[in-house]
């Protein structure tokens, strides 16, 4: 007889049924969303560097980093400086937001954490029908590939801190709208 049962995180998918979609300003962009705290464990610096490489190949890419920047102000400042040093356009730090106000504008989301449990941002992306790029940490592998559910993959899994691999994943999803749609439906 088991005395412990693990209950994974969950979200109310009904809250994602009627979310705003792309706006007029989004029509010429491929929006990449990152819903996270700007902290070292989320490895935002690797994300920024990978985005810089991907944007050279796909100029329409736009990265939305959505979440608080005040938890580790020094690290957030280093991220802002990195964007400036690399001279990257089209990276927006929104600060705290209501995820449902933005997620429908995204073509795919990304998570480059070096450690996770079961990230809510992946569940929120799937509830909105959006595929995910995530590092192979915590429960990300099972969330992306399923557990013998027969649905297929719902995103791309990468190694942690692998700038080239993460950039290639961004390029793949950016250049393949049908693949994005298929993966989004699988989520």
Annotate each language-model stretch with its function.
Residues 76-96:
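Nucleotide-activated donor-binding/catalytic signature segment of Leloir-type glycosyltransferases, i.e.
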Residues 172, 179-187:
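A short, well-ordered alpha-helix in the C-terminal region of glycosyltransferases
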Residues 95-106, 127:
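Short acidic alpha-helix that forms the nucleotide-activated donor recognition element
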Residues 25-42, 48-51, 64:
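Conserved donor-binding/catalytic core segment of Leloir-type glycosyltransferases
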Residues 145-163, 172-177:
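Conserved acidic donor-binding segment of nucleotide-sugar-dependent glycosyltransferases
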Residues 114:
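Aromatic "clamp/platform" in nucleotide-sugar-dependent glycosyltransferases that forms part
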Residues 10:
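Carbohydrate-associated surface elements
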Residues 131-134, 139-144:
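Short hydrophobic beta-strand element within catalytic cores of glycosyltransferases
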């Amino acid at each position: 007889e088991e005395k412990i049962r693990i209950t994974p995180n969950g979200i109310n998918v009904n809250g994602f049924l009627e979310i705003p979609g792309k706006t007029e300003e989004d029509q010429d962009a491929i929006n990449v969303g990152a819903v996270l705290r700007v902290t070292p464990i989320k490895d935002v610096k690797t994300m920024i560097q990978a985005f810089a490489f991907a944007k050279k190949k796909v100029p329409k890419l736009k990265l939305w980093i959505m979440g608080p920047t005040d938890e580790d102000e020094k690290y957030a400042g280093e991220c802002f400086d990195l964007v400036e040093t690399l001279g990257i356009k089209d990276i927006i730090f929104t600060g705290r937001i209501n995820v449902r106000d933005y997620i429908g504008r995204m073509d795919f989301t990304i998570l480059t954490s070096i450690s996770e449990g079961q990230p809510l941002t992946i569940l929120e992306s799937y509830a909105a029908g959006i595929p995910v790029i995530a590092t192979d940490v915590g429960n990300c592998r099972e969330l992306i590939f399923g557990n013998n559910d027969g649905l297929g993959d719902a995103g791309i899994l990468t190694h942690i801190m692998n700038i080239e691999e993460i950039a290639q994943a961004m390029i793949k999803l950016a250049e393949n709208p049908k693949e994005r749609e298929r993966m989004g439906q699988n989520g």
